[in-house]
Amino acid sequence: MNGSEQAQSAEAAGMTSSADRMVGMDHAEVRYFTSYDHHGIHEEMLKDDVRTRSYRDSIYQNRHIFKDKVVLDVGCGTGILSMFAAKAGAKHVIGVDMSSIIEKAKQIVACNGLSDRITLLQGKMEEVVLPYPKVDIIISEWMGYFLLYESMLDTVLYARDRYLVPGGKIFPDKATMYLAAIEDGEYKDDKIGFWDNVYGFDYSPMKEIALTEPLVDTVELKALVTDPCPIITLDLYTVTPADLAFKVPFTLAAKRSDFIHAVIAWFDIEFGACHKPITFSTGPHAKYTHWKQTVFYLRDVLTVEEEEVVSGVLENKPNDKNKRDLDINISYKFETTDNLRYSEGSCSYRMC
């Protein structure tokens, strides 16, 4: 059986409704997968010029890497990365996605005359049967808010360990997370302080909920009080699922005298397998992406002077009940000769 016949056989074997596939699946998993059934989320991602162009350029500018190779697209969505790979000369591309949007992806692939070179399979990566025993390249857009929220990185790692040939390539292959502290008094008062007086009533119990929910929003560069601090780099060739729960130190040096109301996080992505490496950032210094930045408001307001340092530890782990949610703890200490400004604390957050 040749590659095309294998692909047709794999597609035929996978013709089961989305509802049937999700029977017995955990409710949180069903909610996650069905959220990608709607066109709006795909429109937002495709319109993210930084995201989509970075993937396109990393593939098109490295046609010599993709030529005559078998490529696996993990979480293929509407198939844009699969089509980039096919256009770059891949021998065959296999796209896998659990969402029912894959039916539209098949139509899109057909509209673009690529059905003979792209096989799209609906199902979980751990359960589908690929038409090839091994692949030369894995491509995936797996990143979530705060890099790992609702992330499918563990699925990419499964695909790497199960299907990638020795010496195979992963696009992208590196992710680095950064922290910085910001002045954001006005917004914090609106989001947190609001609960102190709601039409004359004390709603302060709601502040606890508000403080534990990170905010995903665009932060202006001028709000940064400290220099960025890289806290962790994930190398997709070597990282393991266990590494996705981590506890890392950070040091934030003030670049001006100001107040600190929150800590923000963002990530940079690198396509290091390229002849000329391609990178993009989701930070406040870079062009807008749909990932924005993640804001963690602190209970205390810190008053820092230029060159003073806030040190601490960030701990991240998947939630025990829903592995796609994150439990995050940030502990910090601000030591200064001025005892009135000394501050130390710990805040716990839940991304859900």
Language model segments and positions:
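Class I SAM-binding transferase module
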Residues: 1-74, 78-352
